[in-house]
């Protein structure tokens, strides 16, 4: 039987593009792990994705994961859009390169060993874990220490 894990995520960007950060909380039973980092120049969507990626990549064995995000971009991208992007060689319907393809590929790989249920939560609506992740992300964005090497101005 797979371990049951809950992951809560949020991303933040001051300027979009601008300094950004992510926050994630991973919960297994009574155990909780916090993830957070800030980047000097990035976008909100990239930080939303990084929150999910970092938490999923921290799992050391296949798990049943309920991942809560307030990002429709991440939830729709991974549950709907990604299948056709992959079929088209990571191109959109109008044959343009998919934005943030480096992170979509990384997220896709991070999901491959797990049974994932995606849950959308309304941001800034009093959801306790989402509010905590938002605070982690905003604090990280306010003190960026990393370079987002995959960020390009077209992303």
From Swiss-Prot:
Assigned keywords, A-Z: Cytoplasm, Endonuclease, Hydrolase, Magnesium, Metal-binding, Nuclease
Compartment list: Cytoplasm
Domain RNase H type-1: 1-142
Catalyses which reaction(s): Endonucleolytic cleavage to 5'-phosphomonoester
Transmembrane spans: none
Keyword Magnesium: yes
Cofactor: Mg(2+)
Cellular component GO terms held in the UniProt record: cytoplasm
Residues annotated to bind Mg(2+) 2: 10, 134
GO biological process, one term: DNA replication, removal of RNA primer
EC number of the protein: 3.1.26.4
Molecular function, one GO term: magnesium ion binding
Family annotation (InterPro entries): RNase_H, RNaseH-like_sf, RNaseH_domain, RNaseH_sf, RNaseHI
Cofactor note: Binds 1 Mg(2+) ion per subunit. May bind a second metal ion at a regulatory site, or after substrate binding.
Binding site residues for Mg(2+) 1: 10, 48, 70
Subunit comment: Monomer.
Family, per entry: Belongs to the RNase H family.
PANTHER family assigned to the protein according to its UniProt record, in alphabetical order: RIBONUCLEASE H1 (PTHR10642:SF26)
Function description: Endonuclease that specifically degrades the RNA of RNA-DNA hybrids.
Protein name: Ribonuclease H
Organism: Erwinia tasmaniensis (strain DSM 17950 / CFBP 7177 / CIP 109463 / NCPPB 4357 / Et1/99)
Gene: rnhA
């Amino acid at each position: 039987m797979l371990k049951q894990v809950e992951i809560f995520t949020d991303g933040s960007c001051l300027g979009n593009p601008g300094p950004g950060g992510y926050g994630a909380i991973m919960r297994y039973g009574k155990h909780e792990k916090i993830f957070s980092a800030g980047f000097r120049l990035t976008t909100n969507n990239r930080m939303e994705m990084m929150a999910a990626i970092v938490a999923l990549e921290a799992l050391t064995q296949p798990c049943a994961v309920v991942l809560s995000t307030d990002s429709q971009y991440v939830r729709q991208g991974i549950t709907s859009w990604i299948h056709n992007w992959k079929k088209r060689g990571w191109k959109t319907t109008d044959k343009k390169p998919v934005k943030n393809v480096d992170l979509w590929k990384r997220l896709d790989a991070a999901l491959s060993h797990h049974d994932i249920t995606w849950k959308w939560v309304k941001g800034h609506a009093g959801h306790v874990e989402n509010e905590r992740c938002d605070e982690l992300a905003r604090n990280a964005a306010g003190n960026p220490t990393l370079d987002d090497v995959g960020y390009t101005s077209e992303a």
